[in-house]
Structures are given as structure tokens and as C-alpha cells.
């Protein structure tokens, strides 16, 4: 991300404009610490800080710099981490994972539409708002509307 950002910004400066989005993830703001995800989350936190610096350093240049926070996506890497858990550990995590996770193909079209609409630096495009999280927990726990995101992966 660091080197890619450097190369992109150099090119944007030469052409007089451009748009850069950095992908956040994990606990990029340090609010939620997930066991076993320390290194990954630390790198995402550093990307958040890098993005803030890039925004500041490229004001009034014609370069738009923003970030994307896609939420917890079910990726191959994420699935591999879950498969390392014991059956009991996974069964404890599965109900919450069904509430907070999403498939990439669910989130990606929305993110793209938000990128197309945005022309401001400093914007964080975030799929999972606090309202959305609370609504999902309400639907799952009160309305008993359960999601099953993982059976298609055999876990």
C-alpha cells in the first residue's frame, strides 16, 4: 500500500489529478481487538494513518484521496483462519459471524457506486454503519431472522 500509494501519487501529480482509495480493515481504528489478528489489524491501522497523511500532503493538488472500510468480508483468507478453529470455537463464533459478515459480491457493487459518487478527499466509504450492525443484531436476536452465510463453504 505504501509503495503503491507513492507510485500512484507521483503519476497523479504529473498528470495534475487522480483518485486514490486505500482499503481499511481489521480494527483499523483500534476500537475492537480480535485475538490472533494483531499483525493484520496493526497494518490496517497504519494504512489509516498513512491515508490521513496523504490527504493532508496532497491538499489543493487535484488529487482525491479517500478510504474504504468494507466490513468483515468472507474471503479465502478469512475462511482459512476460521478453519483453524476447533469445532467448539467455530460454533461459538458462527452466530455473530453470520450477523456481521458479508460476501464480497454483496458489498462490492455498493462500494463501487459510492466511489463513483465521491469527489472529496478524506471520505471513508464504510459498508457497516453502527445503525446497520444494530439492525442486524435486532433482526437476529429479536425477530429471529437468522442468516446462514457459511453452509456453502462446508463450515
Regions found by a protein language model. Give the residues of each.
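Short alpha-helix in the Rossmann-fold core of NAD(P)-dependent oxidoreductases
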Residues: 1, 5, 43, 100
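Structural signature of the Rossmann-like NAD(P)-dependent dehydrogenase/reductase core
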Residues: 3-5, 18-25, 64-69
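Hydrophobic positions on the long internal alpha-helix
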Residues: 4-8, 50-51
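Catalytic loop of short-chain dehydrogenase/reductase
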Residues: 13-14, 19-46, 51-52, 56-59, ...
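Short beta-loop-alpha junction of Rossmann-like oxidoreductase domains
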Residues: 31, 72-83
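Short, hinge-like loop/turn segments at secondary-structure boundaries
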Residues: 38, 83-86
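C-terminal helical subdomain
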Residues: 67, 85-138, 142-143
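Functional cleft and adjacent loop/helix regions within the main domain
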Residues: 144-155
